[in-house]
C-alpha cells in the first residue's frame, strides 16, 4: 500500500501530527507508522556546513595565504550526535512505497533550511512528490488544514534560496574576517586584555549589535550633565491654584538670549532670579484655553520582539528564555507561531476569531480574564474586528501576530508558573484589542504675564476602555502627561495634573488671574538609558531607523538586523564569548573590556561592520531573494565581491 511520509522538526511536534491523524501505532525507533502514514522527525539541525579544513587540510591553520576562503562547491555533513536519527529519516525518505513526502518543518526560513539540508543529503525517492506543510499553530484544525492545503515544495524554493544564502553569508563573513582580524590584531588584543592569546570573533549581525552596545555605553560614559534653571509660576482663583512653566516666545525679552540653556531654562540661577524680579507686580492673563477630548486605542498585538521586550521588563528574563517559553506554549497548542515579525492578524483569521474567544471563555479559568471576557461579550465589543488597525494582510509575511488559540488547556495546569504568566500577558494583549479606546478630557492653558508665557495643562481619563485590561491600577496617574518636558531632563516639573481640570473649569480666555508665587526649579540633562536584554532586541528589529541617509533608510524600510528567530541567540552568544555582560537581576546590558577592545579593532579596520546600514541592507537582500525580487546568484556575487574587496583593503592596512 502506498505511504505518505511526514517529517517534523521535533519529536513533540510529530506526536501532535500523529494525534491529529489518529495514528495509534506504537512509536518505533525514530518514527511512527500506520497503514497509510509514516511520521518521523528531526531533532533540530541534522546537517551542518563543513569546516574549512574539510575542503583542504591547510585551512585548519589560520594563515593569511589561505584567505579569503570562498568555496565554489559547498560541502555539508551529518552532525555526529544525531547521525542515528538522520539514518532513520534517510531510510524512510528512500522507501519505494513512499509516494508523498510532507515537509512539516518549522514554518519559517530557518525551518525550511533544516529540512532542505536533510533532503539534499538523504536523496529522497525521486518518484515521491514533496509537499510543504505551512501552519500558524498546532491546533488540530490548523494541522489538518496544513496537510490538506500543502503546496508543492517548489513554491518555497525562493525561501530556501534565501535560507541557504543567509547561512553562506554568515559562514563566509565569520570565517574570513574572524581569521583575518585575528591574524592582524590578535596579539594587540591579547595585550590589551592581559591574556596570553586572543582571537577575534566577527559576525554579520553579532558585530553590529556589539557596536550598538559599546556606542551607547560610551555615549553614557562621555556624557556631561548640564544644570539649568526653570521658572514655575503658581496662579489661582477661587477654585484653587495651579502651576505653569515659563517658556520663551518671540515677544519675550529673553528671546534668543545667550543666558538661556534652552527654551525654558536659564544657564545661571542668578539670571533666573533676576528674571523673576522683573515679573513682580505684573498682571497674569489667560490668553489661550483649549479643551479637547482624546481617544487612545489599545496597542498592536505582540510579535516576538515585542513580547521579548515586555517579558524582560516584567519578569527580568532574557530574550532567548522568552522564546523558549513561547515555543513551549506553541507546542502545547496554547498560542500561535512565535517567530513572527507581524503585529496584526490576517482578514481570514479575524473572520474566525470567535473560535479563539470562545475557547478562552470555556477553557481559561483565570478569574480576572473571565470577567473581562464576559464584559466584552455582554457589551458586544468583539464585533467588526476586520475593519480595525489590528487586521492588515499587507503587513504579514510568513505568520501573523502571537495570539492565544483558545485551545490546549489540557496542558495548562502542568505549565511552570512563569510560563503561565507569559501566557497571561499574551491573552491580555489579545483581549485588549476588542475593548473600546481609552478616553481623556484635556485642557491646555496659556498664561501671559506681560510679554512672558507660562504653560499648563490638565488631563484625566474619563473612560478606561482598553486600560481596564492592560492597566487596571493607577490609570489616571499613569496616563497623566508631563507638559513641556525638556528631552533628556531628569528634573521634570509636573505642570500637567488631573486636579488642574477642577481649577480650570470656571476659567475663561481673557480672564485675569491671581499670581501666587514664582519659584526656580533645578533641572539637569541626563544621558540615554542603557539597553536591557529586551530593549536591545527591539533596537535590532528597528535598526533600519538608525540609518542617517534618508533615501537608504526608506529603501530598506522595515529591515532589521537578525531575524525574530535569531536575535535572542545572538545576544546569548555575545554574552557567552564575554563581549557583553547582562545583569541577572536588572537585565541591563554593558560591554566588557574585551568587547570594547574588539569594537575598537573593528572600528579601525572595517567600521561598516558596526553600522546597522550594512547588516540591514544584507537582510533586506535576503528578503528580496525570498520574494523573488532578485536572483540568488545576484546576491551571492555581491557577497563575494564585498569579501574580496574588504579583504584586499585590510591587507593593505597591515
Where are the regions a protein language model picked out?
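Intrinsically disordered, low-complexity regulatory segments
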Residues: 1-179, 266, 387, 500, ...
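OB-fold/S1-family RNA-binding modules
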Residues: 52, 97-102, 144, 243-269, ...
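C-terminal helical "lid" subdomain and adjoining coupling/linker elements of P-loop NTPases
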Residues: 192-201, 213-268, 314, 338, ...
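A conserved hydrophobic secondary-structure block that centers on an alpha-helix together
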Residues: 310, 314-318
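Metal- or metallocofactor-binding catalytic centers and their adjacent structured scaffolds
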Residues: 256-300, 308
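Basic, low-complexity terminal or inter-domain segments flanking catalytic cores
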Residues: 2-5, 24, 28, 82, ...
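Conserved PLP-enzyme active-site core in the AAT-like
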Residues: 206
Amino acid at each position: 500500500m502506498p505511504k505518505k511520509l511526514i517529517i517534523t522538526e521535533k519529536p513533540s511536534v510529530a506526536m501532535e501530527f500523529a494525534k491529529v491523524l489518529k495514528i495509534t501505532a506504537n512509536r518505533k525507533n525514530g518514527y511512527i507508522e500506520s497503514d497509510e502514514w509514516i511520521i518521523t522527525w528531526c531533532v533540530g539541525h541534522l546537517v551542518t556546513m563543513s569546516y574549512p579544513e574539510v575542503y583542504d587540510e591547510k585551512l585548519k591553520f589560520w594563515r593569511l595565504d589561505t584567505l579569503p576562503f570562498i568555496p565554489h562547491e559547498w560541502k555539508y555533513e551529518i552532525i555526529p550526535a544525531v547521525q542515528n536519527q538522520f539514518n532513520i529519516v534517510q531510510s524512510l525518505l528512500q522507501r519505494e512505497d513512499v509516494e508523498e513526502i510532507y515537509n512539516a518543518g518549522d514554518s519559517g526560513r530557518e525551518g525550511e533550511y533544516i529540512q532542505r539540508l536533510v533532503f539534499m543529503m538523504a536523496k529522497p525517492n525521486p518518484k515521491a512528490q514533496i509537499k510543504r506543510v505551512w501552519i500558524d499553530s498546532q491546533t488540530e484544525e490548523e494541522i489538518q488544514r496544513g496537510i490538506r492545503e500543502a503546496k508543492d515544495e517548489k513554491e518555497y524554493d525562493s525561501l530556501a534560496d534565501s535560507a541557504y544564502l543567509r547561512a553562506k553569508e554568515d559562514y563566509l563573513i565569520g570565517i574570513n574576517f574572524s581569521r583575518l582580524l585575528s591574524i592582524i590584531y590578535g596579539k594587540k588584543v591579547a595585550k590589551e586584555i592581559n591574556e596570553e592569546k586572543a582571537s577575534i570573533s566577527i559576525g554579520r549581525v553579532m558585530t553590529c549589535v556589539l557596536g550598538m552596545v559599546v556606542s551607547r555605553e560610551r555615549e553614557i560614559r562621555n556624557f556631561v550633565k548640564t544644570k539649568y534653571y526653570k521658572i514655575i509660576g503658581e496662579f489661582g482663583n477661587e477654585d484653587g491654584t495651579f502651576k505653569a512653566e515659563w517658556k520663551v516666545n518671540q515677544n519675550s525679552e529673553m528671546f534668543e538670549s545667550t543666558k538661556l540653556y534652552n527654551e525654558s531654562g536659564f544657564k545661571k540661577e542668578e539670571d533666573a532670579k533676576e528674571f523673576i524680579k522683573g515679573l513682580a507686580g505684573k498682571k497674569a492673563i489667560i490668553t489661550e484655553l483649549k479643551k479637547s477630548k482624546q481617544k487612545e486605542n489599545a496597542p498592536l498585538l505582540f510579535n516576538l520582539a515585542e513580547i521579548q521586550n515586555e517579558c524582560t521588563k516584567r519578569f527580568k528574563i532574557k530574550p532567548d528564555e522568552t522564546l523558549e517559553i513561547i515555543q513551549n506554549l506553541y507546542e502545547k497548542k496554547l498560542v500561535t507561531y512565535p517567530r513572527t515579525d507581524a503585529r496584526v492578524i490576517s482578514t481570514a483569521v479575524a473572520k474566525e476569531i470567535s473560535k479563539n474567544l470562545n475557547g478562552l471563555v470555556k477553557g481559561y479559568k483565570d478569574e480576572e480574564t473571565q470577567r473581562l471576557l464576559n464584559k466584552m461579550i455582554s457589551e458586544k465589543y468583539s464585533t467588526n474586528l476586520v475593519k480595525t488597525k489590528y487586521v492588515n494582510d499587507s503587513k504579514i509575511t510568513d505568520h501573523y501576530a502571537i495570539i492565544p488559540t483558545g485551545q490546549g488547556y489540557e496542558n495548562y495546569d502542568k505549565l511552570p508558573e512563569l510560563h503561565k504568566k507569559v501566557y497571561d500577558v499574551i491573552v491580555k494583549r489579545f483581549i485588549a484589542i476588542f475593548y473600546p479606546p481609552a478616553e481623556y478630557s484635556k485642557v491646555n492653558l496659556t498664561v501671559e504675564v506681560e510679554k512672558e508665557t507660562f504653560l499648563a495643562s490638565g488631563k484625566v481619563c474619563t473612560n478606561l476602555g482598553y486600560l481596564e485590561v492592560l492597566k487596571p491600577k493607577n490609570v489616571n496617574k499613569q496616563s497623566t502627561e508631563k507638559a513641556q518636558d525638556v528631552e533628556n531632563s531628569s528634573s521634570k516639573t509636573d505642570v500637567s495634573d488631573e486636579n488642574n481640570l477642577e481649577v480650570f473649569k470656571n476659567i475663561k480666555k481673557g480672564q485675569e488671574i491671581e499670581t501666587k508665587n514664582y519659584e526656580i526649579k533645578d533641572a539637569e540633562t541626563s544621558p540615554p538609558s542603557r539597553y536591557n536584554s529586551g530593549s536591545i532586541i527591539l533596537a535590532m528589529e528597528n535598526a533600519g531607523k538608525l540609518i542617517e541617509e534618508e533615501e537608504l533608510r526608506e529603501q530598506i524600510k522595515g529591515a532589521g538586523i537578525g531575524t525574530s528567530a535569531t536575535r535572542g541567540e545572538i545576544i546569548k552568544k555575545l554574552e557567552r564569548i564575554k563581549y557583553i555582560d547582562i545583569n541577572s537581576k536588572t537585565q541591563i546590558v554593558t560591554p566588557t573590556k574585551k568587547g570594547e577592545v574588539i569594537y575598537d579593532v573593528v572600528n579601525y579596520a572595517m567600521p561598516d561592520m558596526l553600522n546597522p546600514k550594512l547588516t540591514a541592507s544584507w537582510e533586506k537582500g535576503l528578503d528580496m531573494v525570498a520574494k523573488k525580487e532578485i536572483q540568488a546568484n545576484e546576491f551571492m556575487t555581491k557577497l563575494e565581491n564585498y569579501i574580496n574587496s574588504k579583504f584586499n583593503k585590510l591587507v593593505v592596512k597591515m
